[in-house]
Amino acid sequence: MNLTGKKVILHDMSLRDGMHARQHQISLKEMVDVATGLDAAGVPLIEVTHGDGLGGASLNYGFPAHTDEEYLSAVIPKMKQAKVSALLLPGIGTGDHLRMAHDLGVNTIRVATHCTEADVSGQHISLSRELGLDTVGFLMMAHMVSPDKLLEQAKLMESYGANCIYCTDSAGYMLPGDVTSHIERLRGELKSDTQIGFHGHHNMGMSIANSLAAIQAGAERIDGSVAGLGAGAGNTPLEVFVAVLERMQVSHGINLYDIMDVAEDLVTPMMDQPIRIDRDALTLGYAGVYSSFLLFAQRAEKKHGIPARDILLELGRRGTVGGQEDMIDDTAMNMARERA
């Protein structure tokens, strides 16, 4: 693989996807400390919201330590070069949430849907573009569809006004060949000025290999998370990925030592538990289950006595997707009854 001379935009997820690993309890001080560290290290884009995006605070997804408005208001004024993004899932986040983010200075809105449901994103993508925001269509659980189907959905988002489309491996299920086929299909058929992005999870240990495959296939934006802080076994560990890109002579604009220090000195100490590929996280990737289901399944194990990996395998068999968190406890309860 020769990526010499390629240029990528790296996007940190530690303060949004990392919310899942922290049960949405990141403090304002932690948020600001990490964000300013990332900014100083040269990270160009930093995502800040509830783990499930703007408006995600709920009984179903979890109540955060602070509101999205409080987090964004604390971080954005401190940024010297980095831009701040926010995730929005139609049905959770609203137009009012989007306007609030714009008014606070958010640069990028990423409108996320399941990989077959791009048609629900039209209003939010259109509004984001009307407000002059960098607007991303974020197609989750991309492993569940063929490259042709992903392209069909991507074209819908592009038609609504998205200037960047993401292939999102929410389960950490994809292998490099899968990433290549999906990204190549997008790059070959979308408008030449529509950027392509890739978001990986490390549940099968493939996030760096998959991200490299994405770059080779034409992706220009790559998500990562400092120290891997994110749902499941975490996202592509950003400091490790930067080191790999350095060796492969890919331009990224981040200071390696500085990003290593943010990971070691700021992010790792605030973890509730080590971000690693344990048996439950591995099961997420193996079964193709949404990564943020991990802690829900572990809580269901304690409540019903069914091993989390058994619950996750059953959820994978049923084809559950993000937004069906309420099914996790029901599934565990039914499995417990059947085994009684």
UniProtKB/Swiss-Prot annotation:
One GO MF term attached to the UniProt entry: 2-isopropylmalate synthase activity
Reaction catalysis annotation: (S)-4-hydroxy-2-oxopentanoate = acetaldehyde + pyruvate
Binding site for substrate: 16-17, 170, 199, 290
Signal peptide: none
The keyword Cytoplasm belongs to this UniProt entry's keyword annotation: no
GO biological process, one term: catabolic process
Site annotation Transition state stabilizer: residues: 16
Enzyme class: lyase
Catalytic residues (UniProt): 20
Sorted UniProt keywords: Aromatic hydrocarbons catabolism, Lyase, Manganese, Metal-binding
InterPro entries referenced in this protein's UniProt entry, alphabetically: 2-IPM_HCS-like, 4OH_2_O-val_aldolase, Aldolase_TIM, DmpG_comm, DRE_TIM_HOA, PYR_CT
Pyruvate carboxyltransferase domain location: 8-260
Enzyme Commission number(s) of this protein: 4.1.3.39
Keyword Calcium in annotation: no
Binding site for Mn(2+): 17, 199, 201
Domain of life: Bacteria
Family the UniProt entry places it in: Belongs to the 4-hydroxy-2-oxovalerate aldolase family.
Official protein name in the record: 4-hydroxy-2-oxovalerate aldolase
Organism: Shewanella pealeana (strain ATCC 700345 / ANG-SQ1)
